[in-house]
């Protein structure tokens, strides 16, 4: 345990390269009273990691360790740590300082894989308040899928959406957030519509319980198919991950008094090109969702401990294959999550 491998972003002329480095392993003797030394065992990627890597948002992450999502084992704890002990299996929170309550803009200054070093390293030190026990019986690879994608889906549908049995949900695409949203919605007794450009991915979604699948390459105005399927009622919830390129169809899909959880920007950062009047006319609630708090994460873990859910891991890569994993993320071929094993 002499060296800690890690990947960092290194600025090039237009974006960032991924550069492998080593550094000394943090010493347990140097832990502050409330800190824990974690051996990272697995990391998962999110679309946000592509945004940072390709510099799509113009954010300076030069020298930072990528990836917000990972899980591992506690090796040592500081003198005042009361929540954990060595050997505990944990995941880190996306926002390490957001423990509970309302979101504060200050939390943006402390996000893993952004302003703070992320999880693509062998060892990391965290305050005990930034960690959560992983679900019982889950592998590190499975648990690594949770901190961003699963928590986001949970907050969108459960805490903010108040999803009820018998309601209807539309999830866009088959990435990490959307597939967790599909799985949570089915466990909670909802009917789910899934959109994708791939019939093969839609078949996988059906196997997870999707009630209606729409290939948006074949049916660009997919809201019409959804509208007919729903008995011209619309759906109660839309998990909107596309952004400006899909927002018009999402607005046309949502029911009166419905809910749109605005989560992603897969189609870019520009403004919507359509009128927002349907939101007003249908009395729709629009929620911006940026992951969630530690309380949200722990509530979700409690749910997972009492329900059967298997994270959908599309491919696993070795640590030294990290650039290949990022390329695969960019290809958008994956269904669910991409994991890097350490």
Predicted regions and their residues:
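Adenosine-nucleotide cofactor-binding segment
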Residues: 168-174, 186-249
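C-terminal capping/lid region of NAD(P)-dependent oxidoreductase domains
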Residues: 2-4, 232, 308-312, 323-342
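Residue-level marker of beta-strand positions
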Residues: 71-73, 89, 123, 168, ...
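N-terminal Rossmann-fold NAD(P) dinucleotide-binding loop
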Residues: 178-179
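Glycine-rich beta-strand-centered segment in the early N-terminal region that forms part
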Residues: 26-44, 54-99, 115-117, 135-138
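NAD(P)H dinucleotide-binding glycine-rich loop of Rossmann-like/cofactor-binding domains
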Residues: 95-172
């Amino acid at each position: 345990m002499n060296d800690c491998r890690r990947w960092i972003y290194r600025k090039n002329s237009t974006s960032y390269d991924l550069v492998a480095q080593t550094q000394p392993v943090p010493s347990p003797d140097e832990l502050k009273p409330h800190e824990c030394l974690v051996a990272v065992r697995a990391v998962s990627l999110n679309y946000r990691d592509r945004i940072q890597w390709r510099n799509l948002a113009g954010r300076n992450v030069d020298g930072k360790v990528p990836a917000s999502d990972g899980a591992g084992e506690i090796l040592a704890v500081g003198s005042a740590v009361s929540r954990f002990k060595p050997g505990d299996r944990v995941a880190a929170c996306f926002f390490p300082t957001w423990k509970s309550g309302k979101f504060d803009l200050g939390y943006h200054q402390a996000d893993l894989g952004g302003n703070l070093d992320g999880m693509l390293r062998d060892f990391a030190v965290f305050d005990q308040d930034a960690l959560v026990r992983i679900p019982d019986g889950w592998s590190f690879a499975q648990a690594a899928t949770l901190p961003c994608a699963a928590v986001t889906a949970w907050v969108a549908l459960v805490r903010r959406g108040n999803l009820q049995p018998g309601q209807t949900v539309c999830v866009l695409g088959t990435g990490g957030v959307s597939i967790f949203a599909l799985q949570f919605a089915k466990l909670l007794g909802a009917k789910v519509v899934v959109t994708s450009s791939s019939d093969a991915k839609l078949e996988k979604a059906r196997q997870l319980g999707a009630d209606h699948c729409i290939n948006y390459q074949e049916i660009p105005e997919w809201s019409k198919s959804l509208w007919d399927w729903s008995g011209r009622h619309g759906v109660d919830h839309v998990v909107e991950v596309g952004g400006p390129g899909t927002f018009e169809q999402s607005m046309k899909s949502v029911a009166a008094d419905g809910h749109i959880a605005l989560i992603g920007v897969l189609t870019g950062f520009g403004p919507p090109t359509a009128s927002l009047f349907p939101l007003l006319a249908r009395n729709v609630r629009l929620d911006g969702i940026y992951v969630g708090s530690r309380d949200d994460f722990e509530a979700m873990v409690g749910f997972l401990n009492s329900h059967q859910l298997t994270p959908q891991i599309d491919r696993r890569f070795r640590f030294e294959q990290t650039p290949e994993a990022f390329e695969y993320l960019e290809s958008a071929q994956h269904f669910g999550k991409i994991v890097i094993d350490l």
